[in-house]
């Protein structure tokens, strides 16, 4: 029997009739943009051909200023660090599963394709940030440390974990600053923190489905705690609400707290978004029972946080996209979505759950829901190490020293976004050599803008496509001796060397220890990841070839 309060956002579509005020970039502004970002754009053979900035909300929250992000180069670089990876995925990887006959579409193939898309997104995002940080003059210099990331955790029966990503601890900045990051970095260099999900909806990106995107924020705030890459239950909306302990409340009480914050008198006017997972069915049933609608999607729970409560965003029944109440997803998605929501004036509460319990296949939906806080010993140690044992629920204030420090976030649509329909996926005009991207920008002031940028492939589309692919593509299907020769050639080419190093760090971070500006490769960890099929024997050959060809990058193997 159909439930009118539970609907797939792919079938029951949101519309947006709110503010979307266009400001076309003049020729002078386009020229200035190209000059400001010439090193990044030249690296891929791009130039900005034109663009429009659509203002969605220009009100300020009164809690912040831009800080170091008064630099247009820095804040626009965050937009580029979302837009260019999205373009790269569409050039090489989007919808790849659809090119394979159905009878050959195995779980292993899907995971390989997902890793491919994560790899290329992480590659380009890293390169944009590194190239940008190398161009700042004395007095404007920054160093960026990755503090929050997605893709690390194993998903039993689904993914082996260790997906290509921008790992926690990754640094972007001038070499002399990175080498002194933990000892002797001068105060003139601004330290920034970064959170990212290089692709939210990676599965959708390989299937060619809606609402996949790239996502990151960069902030002046330091992080007080590290949030482990495990599942987080979340309660959030676009209005402030008082903190509560989820151990002491039930779903109806939680719904009332959030409804009151939003000024909603009747539950029959309210929505709470969920991922379509068995673990969520009991919560959805309870909320439906009191009149709350529960729209859902098959993948991706980051973007709803960015637009919930937006004026003019409505489902066909007239309800807005209001909240999440008890939804459970990845910790990185929670953080990367929660900070911009707080900048907009909202609130987000999280609580670490037991991933081992929630991924069991032998439990009913009711048992999954009831077991969500039954931690294993290892999970409890993670929770204690992150210092959540006395307060297991948290907000961004518990993670960050100052959430309202200067900061910018950016989210570029890989495919058409069904939560904000104006955010269309990357469009490629092969004949004209034009690539158009659509990026949502939210800054620490609470401003919301939609940046539509069209890039010209100066040397032609095929040349740009080759420049933007992952270095691993050049090593595919090669024998060991061929890999060694190809890697040696890469190391001896300045551009290829730069790209190879970023690939190596993003790909093999689970088996790397950074010390100063050098690395230690953990050979036994490589072998253990091969055993659990996160890496392959091909990866072993690549690692050994890189260590031999670029010994100056490494201290020793362990």
Model-derived regions, located:
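Glycine-rich phosphate-binding loop plus the immediately following alpha-helix
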Residues: 215, 219-256
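Conserved P-loop NTPase motor module
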Residues: 433-468, 558
């Amino acid at each position: 029997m159909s439930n009118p309060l539970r609907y797939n956002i792919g079938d029951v579509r949101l519309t947006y009739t709110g503010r979307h005020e266009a400001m076309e970039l003049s020729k002078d502004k386009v020229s200035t943009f190209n000059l400001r970002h010439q090193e990044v754009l030249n690296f891929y053979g791009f130039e900005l051909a034109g663009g429009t900035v659509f203002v969605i909300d220009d009100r300020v929250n009164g809690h912040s200023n831009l800080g170091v992000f008064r630099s247009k180069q820095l804040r626009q670089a965050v937009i580029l660090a979302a837009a260019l990876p999205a373009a790269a995925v569409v050039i090489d990887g989007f919808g790849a599963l659809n090119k394979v006959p159905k009878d050959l579409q195995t779980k292993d193939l899907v995971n390989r394709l997902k890793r491919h898309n994560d790899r290329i997104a992480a590659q380009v995002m890293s390169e944009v940030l590194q190239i940008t940080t190398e161009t700042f003059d004395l007095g404007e210099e920054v160093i960026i440390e990755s503090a929050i990331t997605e893709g690390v955790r194993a998903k039993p029966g689904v993914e082996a974990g260790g997906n290509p990503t921008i790992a926690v601890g990754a640094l972007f900045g001038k070499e002399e600053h990175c080498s002194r990051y933990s000892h002797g970095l001068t105060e003139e260099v601004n330290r920034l923190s970064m959170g990212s999900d290089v692709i939210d909806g990676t599965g959708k990106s390989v299937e060619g489905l809606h609402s996949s995107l790239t996502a990151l924020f960069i902030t002046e705030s330091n992080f007080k705690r590290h949030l482990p890459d495990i599942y987080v239950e979340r309660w959030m909306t676009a209005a402030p609400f008082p903190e509560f302990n989820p151990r002491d409340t039930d779903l109806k009480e939680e719904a009332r707290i959030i409804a009151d914050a939003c000024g909603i008198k009747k539950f029959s006017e309210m929505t709470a978004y969920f991922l379509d997972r068995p673990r969520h069915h009991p919560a959805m049933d309870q909320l439906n029972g009191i009149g709350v609608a529960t729209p859902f999607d098959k993948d991706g729970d980051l973007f709803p946080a960015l637009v919930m409560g937006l004026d003019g965003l409505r489902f066909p029944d007239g309800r807005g996209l209001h909240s999440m109440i008890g939804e459970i997803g990845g910790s990185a998605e929670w953080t990367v979505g929660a900070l911009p929501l707080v900048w907009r004036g909202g609130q987000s509460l999280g609580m670490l759950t037991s991933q081992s319990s929630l991924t069991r296949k032998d439990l009913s939906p009711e048992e999954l829901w009831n077991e969500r806080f039954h931690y294993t010993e290892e999970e409890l140690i993670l929770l204690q190490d992150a210092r959540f044992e006395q307060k297991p629920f948290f907000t961004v204030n518990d993670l960050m020293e100052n959430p309202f420090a200067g900061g910018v976030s950016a989210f570029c649509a890989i495919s058409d976004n069904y939560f904000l329909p104006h955010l269309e996926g990357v469009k490629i005009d092969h004949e004209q050599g034009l690539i158009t991207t659509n990026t949502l920008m939210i800054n620490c002031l609470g401003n919301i803008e939609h940046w539509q940028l069209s890039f010209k492939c100066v040397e032609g589309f095929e040349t740009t496509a080759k420049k933007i692919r992952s270095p691993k593509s050049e090593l595919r299907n090669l024998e060991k001796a061929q890999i060694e020769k190809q890697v040696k050639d890469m190391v001896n080419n300045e551009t290829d060397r730069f790209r190879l190093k970023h690939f190596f760090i993003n790909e093999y971070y689970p088996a790397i220890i950074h010390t100063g500006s050098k690395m230690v490769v953990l050979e036994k960890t490589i072998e253990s990841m091969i055993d659990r099929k996160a890496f392959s024997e091909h990866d072993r050959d690549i690692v050994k070839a890189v260590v031999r060809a670029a010994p100056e990058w490494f201290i020793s193997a362990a």
